[in-house]
Amino acid sequence: MIQQESFLTVADNSGAKRIQCIRVLGTNRRYAHVGDVIVAAVKDAMPNMGVKKSDVVKAVVVRTKATLRRDTGNSIRFDDNAAVIINDDKNPKGTRVFGPVARELRERNFTKIVSLAPEVI
């Protein structure tokens, strides 16, 4: 579960390395899970890239350490909390996605991120 002040690694090549959650988008939401959109501040970034430190960006959560329970009875858990930076059209800013992503992103209409990911779990 991601909440305000949570740090996430960035799983794309947009230029940011770490982001900190500012707000979970939605009506009075406290926690974000896989597939939820958050507003975040860039805390660590690579130089000469598209995203700079202290930029405020939107991102979609693609991996969480918290257990994700599926309707089939399976549960899945990742090693880190990760997000992909997106623009207002819900398209990723980067051109590559690193690491596995959850299948729930396809149900939330983030098909571009799913197609860029090397593995969908």
Swiss-Prot record:
Organism the protein comes from: Synechococcus sp. (strain WH7803)
Gene3D superfamilies: Ribosomal protein L14
Ribosomal protein keyword on record: yes
One of the protein's GO biological processes: translation
Keywords, sorted A to Z: Ribonucleoprotein, Ribosomal protein, RNA-binding, rRNA-binding
Homology family: Belongs to the universal ribosomal protein uL14 family.
Pfam families hit by this protein: Ribosomal_L14
Subunit structure: Part of the 50S ribosomal subunit. Forms a cluster with proteins L3 and L19. In the 70S ribosome, L14 and L19 interact and together make contacts with the 16S rRNA in bridges B5 and B8.
SMART domains attached to this UniProt entry: Ribosomal_L14
Keyword tRNA processing: no
NCBIfam families (alphabetical): rplN_bact
Function: Binds to 23S rRNA. Forms part of two intersubunit bridges in the 70S ribosome.
Protein's UniProt name: Large ribosomal subunit protein uL14
HAMAP family the record matches: Ribosomal_uL14
Native organism taxonomy: Bacteria, Bacillati, Cyanobacteriota, Cyanophyceae, Synechococcales
GO molecular function: large ribosomal subunit rRNA binding; structural constituent of ribosome
GO cellular component labels: cytosolic large ribosomal subunit
